[in-house]
Amino acid sequence: MIGIYKIENTINHKVYIGQSVDIEMRWKEHLYALTRNLHENHHLQNSWNKYGAKAFTFSIIEECELSCLTDREQYYIDLYGGINSDNNYNNRDAGYKGNLSESTK
């Protein structure tokens, strides 16, 4: 399934918004990294470590065409306060595929 997904901390209600052409596989990748303390998003990883897996939910928030993935991901990142906000674990704009700098992590 192609679309936009949300990982939400049910305790503090912070969210991580992402996009994928295979949402189920992407969720498995997040789980793999988070459970091994390897997630590239240090803010999300720290919350996972603090609150535990049971404090997080994963949901698909929109199915969309491949051509609109980045625009829709950015829409939801902005809807939840934008990058590096108090409501959002996202630390880069939608569609970014490069490596994070140490300061961004």
Regions found by a protein language model. Give the residues of each.
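Structure-specific nucleic-acid interaction/processing domains
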Residues: 1-105
